[in-house]
Amino acid sequence: MVPNDEPLDGANNVFCFAALADKQSGTIYTDATGALPAISLDGNQAYFVAYDYDSNYIFAEPIKSQKDESIIEGFETVFSELKSKGYKPQFNVTDNQAANSIKRYLATQDCKWQFVEPTNHRVNAAERAIQTFKNHFISGLCSTDRDWPIQLWDQLTDQAIITLNILRT
């Protein structure tokens, strides 16, 4: 509402704020982005994004599609990276995309899971991590030469992840 209590554009506006507080150690939030405008030369067309609550770290892994196999490859990469740094994911919050494959994979990793409803994006912190990563990644794309081939977008991933997480800490 504007200070004089008149609705903007003749409509009521509702502002919602959600805060994330997690007492459970080892929680990781995961989701996949939508398809990017160009398929990379390596065949990637989306990102698998994970947010680790304990380390406050955003992971982004290029994936070839939003099919089960690609999403599980993203999980494997993130889990191995976390384990190599001494973290063991114990609880995963994700949407129900590739639910059966995710359940099988998480069971092999001794990790519990929670699926959020498809319409409730506030519960999954990965949704906010996706927004943060995409904003940062797009700003990096804007710094490339105008003749740079957009099909190489996935080659910028490592640099984007490093700079994103340095700037956020």
What are these regions (language model features)?
Residues 1-135:
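Retroviral integrase
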Residues 121-169:
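Charged alpha-helix within mobile-element recombinases
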